[in-house]
Amino acid sequence: MKIRPLHDRVIVKRMEEERKTASGIVIPDTAAEKPDQGEIVAVGAGKKDDQGKLISLDVKVGDRVLFGKYAGQTVKVEGEELLVMREEDIMGVVEQ
């Protein structure tokens, strides 16, 4: 199954966080915080302005982005957890 986001929405795959502290203590899943970074795997066509003109998104597939801890809606596709969120929920793009 494949998801195609509509309008100004994007599909984001969360980045895996390190499950071990610097001193070697393993953090259990129940105590670990959700990662606030992810990679964009799909983008919508864009948002229409008041005149009906399509405004394209500033992010693209493959961008590594920062977002709020509780941003977006979690969906499960083929056993993989993905986030569906609006472009405005993205705080920035991580430059590499």
From Swiss-Prot:
GO terms for cellular component: cytoplasm. Signal peptide: none annotated. GO terms for molecular function: ATP binding; metal ion binding; protein folding chaperone; protein-folding chaperone binding; unfolded protein binding. Keywords: Chaperone, Cytoplasm. It holds the Pfam family Cpn10. It is found in: Cytoplasm. InterPro entries: Chaperonin_GroES (IPR020818), Chaperonin_GroES_sf (IPR037124), Chaprnonin_Cpn10_CS (IPR018369), GroES-like_sf (IPR011032). Its main location: cytoplasm. PROSITE patterns: CHAPERONINS_CPN10. GO terms for biological process: chaperone cofactor-dependent protein refolding. HAMAP family: CH10. Belongs to the GroES chaperonin family. Heptamer of 7 subunits arranged in a ring. Interacts with the chaperonin GroEL. Together with the chaperonin GroEL, plays an essential role in assisting protein folding. The GroEL-GroES system forms a nano-cage that allows encapsulation of the non-native substrate proteins and provides a physical environment optimized to promote and accelerate protein folding. GroES binds to the apical surface of the GroEL ring, thereby capping the opening of the GroEL channel. This is Co-chaperonin GroES. It comes from Thiobacillus denitrificans (strain ATCC 25259 / T1). The lineage of its organism: Bacteria, Pseudomonadati, Pseudomonadota, Betaproteobacteria, Nitrosomonadales.
